Amino acid sequence: GDDVKSACCDTCLCTKSNPPTCRCVDVGET
């Protein structure tokens, strides 16, 4: 599937890079 596009965390900001990198900050990631 689109696992590559889903690489970003749901609660994290995703950079518009290719491949997109997950900028995980403390946003309820418990």
From Swiss-Prot:
Tell me which residues are marked as the site Reactive bond for trypsin. Answer: 16-17
Q: What does this protein do?
A: Inhibits trypsin (IC(50)=24.3 nM) and, to a lesser extent, alpha-chymotrypsin (IC(50)=0.51 uM).
Organism field = Lathyrus sativus (White vetchling)
What's one GO BP annotation on this UniProt entry? negative regulation of endopeptidase activity
Protein name in UniProt: Bowman-Birk type proteinase inhibitor 2
Q: Which Cys-Cys disulfides exist here? A: 9-24, 14-22
User: Per UniProt, which keywords does this protein have?
Assistant: Disulfide bond, Protease inhibitor, Serine protease inhibitor
Q: Which domain of life is it from?
A: Eukaryota
Q: Which Pfam families match?
A: Bowman-Birk_leg
Q: Give me the Gene Ontology terms describing cellular component.
A: extracellular region
Record InterPro entries: Bowman-Birk_prot_inh, Prot_inh_BBI
Q: What is the lineage of its organism?
A: Eukaryota, Viridiplantae, Streptophyta, Embryophyta, Tracheophyta
Q: Which GO terms describe its molecular function?
A: serine-type endopeptidase inhibitor activity
Q: Which family does it belong to?
A: Belongs to the Bowman-Birk serine protease inhibitor family.
